[in-house]
Amino acid sequence: MNYVTFNQDYTCLAVGTAKGFRIYHTDPFSKIFTGDNENVTIIEMLFSTSLVAIKQSPRHIVIQNTKRGTVICELTFPSAVLAVRLNRKRFAVLLEEEIYLYDIQNMGLLYTISTSANPNAICALSASSENCYLAYPLPKPREETGDKRPAHAPPLSPYVAPTSGEVLIFDAKSLKAVNVVEAHRAPLSCIALNNDGTLLATASETGTIIRVFSVPDGQKLYQFRRGTYPSTIFSLSFNMSSTLLCVSSNSDTIHIFRLGGPVTGMPESPRSPNGKDKWKRSRSFDSDNGSPPAGTSPGSEMADVPVEKSKSTGTFGSMIRRSSQMMGKSVAGVVGGYLPQAVTEMWEPARDFAFIKLPKGGMGATSRSGPLKSVVAISSSSPQVMVVTSDGGFYIYSIDMEAGGEGVLVKQYSGRRQSRAAS
């Protein structure tokens, strides 16, 4: 497999291969279309319509109608296409340092966005036509050094690679940037918008902390701990009702977090004293970057305090040191009554309410390089999680919405072979 993705409402699955592409219904799982295009490295669907966007060569995108077997349009770009995003209003094409935004009704180019280098194509476009937001890493301007470059040297990009995890929220309808969310200290590794375009989930390169923010105002609503040690996040996915968030990584555990509980409200950060902030910023940081404070474990929440609140008095620091050996939930609850919400969060990290363990060895295929990658989605019709792995496996797990805990494998499929797991 070269590429795999779910459509916007998770009712279909598209797979790109060296021999073409295939489209499947997810419930019940069945193949509904096969395309014989050679070497499809990207494929994206528009909901359950017959419109698909495919990439076969590095700089070329073809939009075609699978039902009629016709090409709607072809687009060629100045550099390699890294990703495609679309909804019923907009069509976005990501290059390493640019995003091209089109009106999907007539495929007219609306806007070109310059970005920092984004080789991992970190970007999300909401499925909603009303809350039509595009999210991507905030470009970091290049600082002027005064050094003169040779006349024959190619021009430098105005931006450099991000060193922190800030997300720019761009209104793809009005074509204006509307907010910046300071989500993590370390650079981003994965972001996702919910179906309604009202929630943003983020993960940094460290992968221990997952955060959820409101869109477009950028208020931090939830903070979850995926694990203690660093991990590469492959996929973030909300369910259709935005009550669950599913996270896959390079570990064999998939985490499901519940969004329906109390929010971890954060006070709004003060505006910049010089008044130059173009957008309101929601500040929240974690220990993704740098060494953890003394006395904390790997991935500790100790540094997960807004910058404005991070300075503590000697008395408070002494209290932390004296109590670190015996601090439990009950003590944290008592002390929490006297401390700001931002500080008490570090004692009560929200854990997953359900999880999934992927089968060891997957479908038996040997991995060509690196860990088994996975893409996840939550069914829109039942409490089930769908997982697609890079070795060609498609798994369906049932989740107990009351008790949580470990999900139960219900079905699994692979290529021409399919089976139903024992009850």
UniProtKB/Swiss-Prot annotation:
Spans traversing the lipid bilayer: none
Superkingdom: Eukaryota
Alphabetic keyword roster: Autophagy, Endosome, Membrane, Protein transport, Repeat, Transport, Vacuole, WD repeat
InterPro entries membership: PROPPIN, WD40/YVTN_repeat-like_dom_sf, WD40_repeat_dom_sf, WD40_rpt
Entry GO MF terms: phosphatidylinositol-3,5-bisphosphate binding; phosphatidylinositol-3-phosphate binding; protein-macromolecule adaptor activity
Functional description taken from the UniProt entry: The PI(3,5)P2 regulatory complex regulates both the synthesis and turnover of phosphatidylinositol 3,5-bisphosphate (PtdIns(3,5)P2). Necessary for proper vacuole morphology. Plays an important role in osmotically-induced vacuole fragmentation. Required for cytoplasm to vacuole transport (Cvt) vesicle formation, pexophagy and starvation-induced autophagy. Involved in correct atg9 trafficking to the pre-autophagosomal structure. Might also be involved in premeiotic DNA replication.
PANTHER family, A to Z: WD-REPEAT PROTEIN INTERACTING WITH PHOSPHOINOSIDES WIPI -RELATED (PTHR11227)
UniProt-recorded name of the protein: Autophagy-related protein 18
Source organism: Sclerotinia sclerotiorum (strain ATCC 18683 / 1980 / Ss-1)
Gene name tied to this protein: atg18
